[in-house]
């Protein structure tokens, strides 16, 4: 059995309940405000007006630069965010660069905290990579003179599944504007 000292002074039950209520209210109010934080990006994705070029740029050499809009505070979140773009883009990881841009309004809400950076941006980043990959596959298919439906992308290369012909991302981007 545990003995406790009845003479020990601490917080009262009432103080504990009041403190818990205040802390709980702060969490609920703080959390309820989060839904509006990413509203603009969510609306743009739903409306189909999302421009992937704000968050991803590619040059004629096939280098993909992912613009990271969350602060680096020691966990290298840039790698995780760039990876979520790169996986959908089907780009060779050696061709990926990370950029931490200025705080212009075009980047949206640039807050970092609460381990939410990946959670808040994963859907957007996946769509960025997928839309760029689709554009590259369509452009590569056009250069090869084949239907895009029979082409796929992997490791920075678009391949025609029928003939086996290929076009690298750098070949596509050096001859075509996407």
Give a label for each model feature.
Residues 55-57, 88, 143, 149-150:
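Short, surface-exposed charged micro-motifs
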Residues 3-4, 63-84, 94-130, 134, ...:
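Short, surface-exposed loop/turn segments at secondary-structure boundaries that line and modulate
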Residues 89-93:
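Phosphate-handling active-site elements
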Residues 36-84:
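Conserved beta-alpha junction segments in alpha/beta enzyme cores
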Residues 1-11:
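N-terminal secretory signal peptides
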Residues 9, 15-37:
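N-terminal export signals
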């Amino acid at each position: 059995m545990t003995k406790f000292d009845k003479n020990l002074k601490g917080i009262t039950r009432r103080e504990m309940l009041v403190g818990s209520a205040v802390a709980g209210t702060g969490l609920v109010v703080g959390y309820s405000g989060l839904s509006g934080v990413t509203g603009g990006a969510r609306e743009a994705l739903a409306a189909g007006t999302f421009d992937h070029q704000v968050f991803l740029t590619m040059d004629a050499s096939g280098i993909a630069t992912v613009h990271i809009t969350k602060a680096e505070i020691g966990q290298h979140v840039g790698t995780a965010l760039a990876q979520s773009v790169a996986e959908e883009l089907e780009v060779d990881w050696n061709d990926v660069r990370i950029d931490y841009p200025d705080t212009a309004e075009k980047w949206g809400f640039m807050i970092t905290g609460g381990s939410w950076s990946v959670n808040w941006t994963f859907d957007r980043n996946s769509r960025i990579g997928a839309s760029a990959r689709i554009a590259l596959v369509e452009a590569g298919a056009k250069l090869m003179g084949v239907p895009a439906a029979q082409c796929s992308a992997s490791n920075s290369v678009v391949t025609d599944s029928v003939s086996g012909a290929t076009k690298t991302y750098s070949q596509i981007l050096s001859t075509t504007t996407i």
